[in-house]
Regions:
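Short helix-loop junctions at transmembrane helix boundaries
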Residues: 1-7, 66, 343, 358-403, ...
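Peri-transmembrane interface segments
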Residues: 2, 66, 259-311, 320-322
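N-terminal Sec/SRP start-transfer signal
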Residues: 3, 15-58, 434
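C-terminal membrane-exit region of the final transmembrane helix in multipass inner-membrane proteins
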Residues: 19-26, 31, 395-434
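Hydrophobic alpha-helical transmembrane segments of multi-pass inner-membrane transport and secretion
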Residues: 39-66, 292-327, 350-359, 409-413
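Hydrophobic, regular-secondary-structure patches
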Residues: 60-143, 168-173
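Basic-flanked hydrophobic alpha-helices used for secretion and membrane insertion
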Residues: 182-278
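Transmembrane alpha-helical interface segments in multi-pass membrane proteins
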Residues: 318, 327-371
């Protein structure tokens, strides 16, 4: 909404400038040349505008990259772009009572629908369960939170899970598991060790298997790595005594998530399936919290920059009016209307804002290029164990537009009061000014 209002305001300013260039060219030329009469003031004001614009551009690019990397990390740590659930999934803590039955048939029907399959990169079911895992040779055991995954799709859906020992799950060997780094440390388990797994299956009985440790992974999220275990979906279904899954994850070829969700919901309604659909953003409370925090900080920075620019422009224009009082009154005395005088000063404010905006973009791109040569080393986020290298994203059209628009808009607004003040000078009193 605020961008729409800003765009409307800029449209009005552009119409005003084009009108002056076409029908009042002398006024536009006179206002532009006036910028060079007091070069020091013009340069200092332009530099202040550029500092604000560059700050918005660089921090906005940093925020964009942070959102992008957090989004990709969220999607590719076994969440996907879209998830399908049984409605009971969010109503009970016993996941065995909220399974999606006959997953294989559901997957086949979705892939046979070309309106959906054309946008799908990967589709995979996952079965959630928990229990106790033991390593008898080391006399260690621990609680685990298990995930049955399809090995091949999980390479994409879990691509941010970094394998630090061994390898990912095999499509052929179904008697192997991978553990989170923290859980493997608790069990003192290493590649090739045999682990005993016990759980309560969907029928209320005991499920038990002995499986071989194929690999150890790290997602960078400590709480998850301390309890995480993955095994092939077929093995997990055998252990739990079901052919269902807890959820179906879909990774898309593009980011048209909302459009795909609408088509998927239509498909579900058409087939009368008792299922619900959620996007990756709905499934990630952590992302929503981080987005709200960083967006709030960014808004505050934009507000501060806008106030600084308004103050600098207003102060410069006021000083300009004081120094040019005799000039203004002379123009008024030879017949210039108050509206004409206001137009001259408004154009000056718009021109200096435009110069500052262009300079902000040029310097912003140069500094972003220098920073991106090496990146910015970032510490781990709260609850995570791995830091990352951040960069400045410069391909966001909205950010580029904002960096240009904000200086122009704020300088135009800051010129209004000084322009009105100049047009209302009393001619007889102003001639006495020295």
């Amino acid at each position: 909404m605020h961008m729409l209002l800003m765009n409307l305001a800029v449209l009005v300013i552009m119409c005003f400038v084009f009108y002056c260039l076409l029908f009042k060219f002398r006024d536009a030329k006179f206002s532009f040349l006036n910028l060079f009469r007091h070069k020091k003031r013009t340069v200092s004001t332009t530099i202040a505008i550029m500092l604000g614009g560059v700050s918005i551009f660089l921090y906005g690019g940093f925020i964009d990259y942070s959102f992008w990397i957090l989004k990709e990390q969220t999607i590719r740590t076994n969440i996907g772009h879209v998830q399908i659930y049984n409605p009971k999934y969010f109503e009970t803590s016993n996941k065995s009572r909220s399974l999606i039955a006959d997953y294989a048939n559901l997957k086949k029907e979705i892939l046979n629908d070309h309106a959906l399959s054309d946008d799908i990169s990967t589709i995979s079911g996952q079965l959630e369960f928990s229990g106790v895992i033991s390593q008898y040779e080391n006399v260690t055991s621990s609680f685990f939170s298990g995930l049955g995954v399809e090995p091949l799709p999980s390479l994409k859906l879990g691509s941010f899970d970094k394998v630090i020992s061994g390898s990912d799950l095999s499509r052929v060997k179904t008697n192997e598991v991978t553990l989170g780094e923290g859980l493997a440390g608790t069990l003192n388990a290493n590649y090739g060790d045999w682990l005993d797994i016990m759980t309560v299956n969907t029928h209320g009985g005991q499920g038990a298997l002995s499986l071989k440790l194929r690999g150890i992974f790290s997602s960078g999220i400590k709480d998850y790595d301390d309890v995480a275990m993955k095994m092939p979906l077929a093995t997990a279904q055998k252990l739990m005594g079901t052919d269902g899954v807890s959820k179906v994850l879909i990774l898309l070829k593009n980011d048209n998530t909302d459009m795909f969700i609408d088509r998927l919901r239509h498909f579900i309604d058409e087939h009368h399936l008792p299922l619900i659909v959620k996007s990756w953003k709905d499934a990630s409370i952590f992302y929503q919290q981080v987005e709200s925090l960083l967006s709030g900080i960014y808004f505050f920075i934009k507000l501060i920059v806008a106030l600084i620019v308004i103050f600098m422009i207003s102060n410069a224009m006021t000083m300009n009016i004081i120094e040019r009082t005799r000039e203004i009154t002379t123009l008024r005395a030879i017949g210039l209307q108050p509206l004409h005088v206001s137009r001259l000063f408004l154009l000056e404010g718009i021109f200096i804002g435009t110069l500052g905006a262009i300079g902000s973009l040029l310097i912003g791109f140069i500094l972003a290029g220098i920073i991106n040569l090496h990146g910015i080393a970032m510490p781990p986020s709260p609850g995570q164990t791995q830091g990352y290298t951040a960069f400045i994203k410069t391909n966001n059209i909205e950010l580029i537009w904002l960096t240009f628009v904000l200086p122009v808009l704020t300088s135009s607004l800051a010129s209004i009061l000084p322009a009105l003040r100049a047009s209302r000078l009393n001619i007889s009193d102003a001639f006495k000014f020295s």
